[in-house]
Amino acid sequence: MTWPPLREELRGIEPYGAPQLDVPVQLNVNENPYGPSPACIADIATSAAEAAVTLNRYPDREFVALRAALADYLSRDTPAGIVPEQVWAANGSNEVMLQLLQAFGGPGRTAVSFAPTYSMYPEYARDTNTRWVAGRRADDFSLDLDAARDLVKTELPSVILLPSPNNPTGTALPPEAVGELCEAAGDGLVVVDEAYGEFRREGVPSALELLPSYRNLVVTRTMSKAFAGAGLRLGYLAAAPEICDAIRVVRLPYHLSAVTQAVALAALRHAPELLGKVDELRVERDALVIWLRDEGCDVADSDANFVLFGRFADRHAVWQGLLDRGVLIRETGPDGWLRVSVGTPDEMAAFRAALTDVDGERA
């Protein structure tokens, strides 16, 4: 046996991770460029200190207060409201997704998504021994509903993963598409990943509105993006209570630390302030889309806090040229395309200047 005794299908695989480079302008992992205010920081510090007093004890494994606060927050996006029994949380959306596949995927079961899609999905499937099947999106990155429905009926997946807005394209799904796939899935789960949901354009609804109609629908969110809490690592979902109960079977004991719960509650108390920058980022995003198109780029419509643009004969050369000028973006998505996060006005000015310089050099 080869040492170490790693599972054979994992040998030679590089760990997931975007480059973490120390450059002046970092626009590669879709973080919120605006940190919390001094008042929010003070509340977080006080809350963490209070939690530290009882760190010799295990935390509330049912995180009752946090579930109630998350339910209140999510209720803004659906007339039916959300109750705490419909909420689950974990250490980032990554752990939420992994728990879903641990509970509802596994050997002999299939997970489906539609490429281009979030690059971690097949890894969740691999790590849970769930068969992975990827359909294709249309050329404009929208979902070909007829083809998607046919794939679901053919593969009979236990879990369908639908990011909306999609990463890396920024494309949002219409509610009719989500509803039709919920019906086509039968008893399979339809997981709508709304990590970037708060950035969607005016009039684009959340899949949360569909929860009363479909017992197999799950909607996931995160505090990493709009809440400027990437360092917090708190993801959560809304679903039927029986789905949340099922996840309890696979969760690790006391998986959410007392400090994580306290800090997340503090952040939720400052939700209006933390989300106040979302409108500014939307404006910056829409201006970026217009500018890139004026520069002759193909640009995907975006409801997220990033923009996918192309098409480049050698996208790596463009990425490297930007990096050489102190701007880090992401080399991801379909061949020939690049993804840039929306930053502050100064960061976007630096990106535009660098891309103009790179284009001039390549002309």
Role assignments for model-derived ranges:
Residues 2-92, 99:
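N-terminal small-domain helix-loop-helix segment of the aminotransferase-like
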Residues 22, 84, 300-306, 333-337:
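Short Gly/Ser/Thr- and Asp/Glu-enriched loop/turn motifs at secondary-structure junctions
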Residues 37, 216-293, 297-300:
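PLP-dependent aminotransferase class I/II
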Residues 54-185, 196-213, 218:
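Conserved core of the PLP fold type I
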Residues 281-282, 291-325, 342:
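Conserved PLP-binding catalytic core of the aspartate aminotransferase-like
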Residues 320-325, 330-363:
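PLP-dependent enzyme catalytic core of the Aspartate aminotransferase-like
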